C-alpha cells in the first residue's frame, strides 16, 4: 500500500512528510493538523513534477517547475559543474534509487525529479531555488562514497 514517512503530532501528520504511493508516484510536503499546508510537490512514476501551495488541504496554486523560474537556480548550478561531476551526481542518485535513466551528465526532467527526491528526504526541504541550498545538495552528492569501485 501507500507509505507515509514523516512526523506525527497527536495522531495527525505534522511537519515534513512524504508519501510513496503504490502506483509509483511520490509526494513531499508540509503538514499541519493532518492536512497538506504550505508548499509540496508531486512526482509521477514517469518523473513529471507538479509544485503546489496548500492551505490546510486545499490547493491554492500549482505550477510546473520545469517551465517556471522557481528552480532554474538548481539547473544552473547543476550545469555549472563539469561533465564528470554531473555524471557523478547522476551516478550517486542512481545508487540511492532516485535516478533510473542513462548517466549522461545532462539536465532533464529525470535529473530534476531525482534531486527533488534527494533534497526532500535527506534535507527535509525543497528550497532548491535558493543558491546556497542548491549548492549544498549538489556538493553533498559529490561527497558521497557509495560505489565500491575495484
How should each PLM-predicted stretch be described?
Residues 3, 13-15, 72-73, 129:
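N-terminal start-of-chain detector that recognizes signal peptides
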Residues 3-14, 26-37, 49-65:
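Conserved anchor residues at repeat-unit boundaries in beta-strand-based tandem repeats, strongest
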Amino acid at each position: 500500500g501507500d507509505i507515509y514517512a514523516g512526523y506525527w503530532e497527536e495522531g495527525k501528520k505534522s511537519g515534513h512528510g512524504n508519501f510513496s504511493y503504490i502506483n509509483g508516484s511520490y509526494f513531499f510536503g508540509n503538514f499541519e493538523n493532518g492536512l497538506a499546508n504550505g508548499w509540496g510537490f508531486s512526482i509521477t512514476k514517469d518523473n513529471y513534477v507538479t509544485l503546489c501551495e496548500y492551505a490546510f488541504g486545499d490547493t491554492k496554486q500549482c505550477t510546473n517547475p520545469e517551465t517556471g523560474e522557481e528552480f532554474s537556480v538548481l539547473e544552473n548550478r547543476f550545469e555549472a559543474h563539469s561533465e564528470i561531476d554531473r555524471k557523478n551526481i547522476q551516478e550517486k542518485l542512481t545508487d540511492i534509487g532516485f535516478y533510473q535513466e542513462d548517466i549522461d551528465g545532462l539536465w532533464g526532467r529525470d535529473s530534476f525529479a531525482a534531486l527533488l527526491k534527494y533534497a526532500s528526504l535527506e534535507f527535509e526541504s525543497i528550497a532548491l531555488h535558493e543558491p546556497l541550498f542548491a549548492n549544498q545538495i549538489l556538493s553533498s552528492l559529490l561527497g558521497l562514497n557509495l560505489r565500491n569501485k575495484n
